[in-house]
Amino acid sequence: MEEEKHHHHHLFHHKDKAEEGPVDYEKEIKHHKHLEQIGKLGTVAAGAYALHEKHEAKKDPEHAHKHKIEEEIAAAAAVGAGGFAFHEHHEKKDAKKEEKKKLRGDTTISSKLLF
C-alpha cells in the first residue's frame, strides 16, 4: 500500500523568487496603479465621512461626543488610506524603473527588491 501524502495547509504560502520566472512589469505597474487608485478612493471616502460626522456633531449636541470620536477615527482612516496610496505610487514608480532597466539591458538588481 502506498502511503498517502499529507498536505499541510499553512497560513502563508511562500514561493521562492527563483521559481517565479520572468516578471511581467506591465502587469505589476497596472496592479500598483489599481491599488493606488483604491487608496485614493479610500482617502476621499473616509475624509467625506469625517466631514459628515463633524456636521453631525454640530447638528446633534446631545450625541456630539460620539460624533467627534467617529470624526477622529474617520480622519485617521483617511490619513492611513492616503499613506497607502502614496506607498503604492512609489511601488508603481519602482516597477516602471525596473522595466526601463530591463529594456536597456541593465542587469543590476536594485537593493530595494532584495529586502
UniProtKB/Swiss-Prot annotation:
Which Pfam families does the record associate with it?
A: ABA_WDS
User: GO CC annotation: what is one?
Assistant: nucleus
- What family classification does the UniProt entry report for this protein? Belongs to the abscisic acid and water stress-induced protein family.
Q: Which GO terms describe its molecular function?
A: identical protein binding; nucleic acid binding; zinc ion binding
Q: Hey, what's the signal peptide range on this chain?
A: none
Q: Does the keyword Ligase apply?
A: no
Which biological processes are named by the entry's GO terms? response to water deprivation; response to zinc ion
> Which taxonomic lineage is given here?
Eukaryota, Viridiplantae, Streptophyta, Embryophyta, Tracheophyta
The residues forming a coiled coil are none
Q: Where is this region: Disordered?
A: 1-22, 83-115
| Compositional bias annotation for Basic and acidic residues | 86-105
Ranges of biased composition (kind: Basic residues): 1-15
Q: What upregulates it?
A: Induced by leaf water deficit and fruit ripening.
The yes or no answer to whether the keyword Metal-binding is present is no
Name used for this protein in its record: Abscisic stress-ripening protein 1
Q: Which domain of life is it from?
A: Eukaryota
**Cellular compartments annotated:** Nucleus
The encoding gene is ASR1
UniProt xrefs under InterPro entries: ABA_WDS
> Where mainly found?
nucleus
Sorted alphabetically, the keyword list is: Nucleus
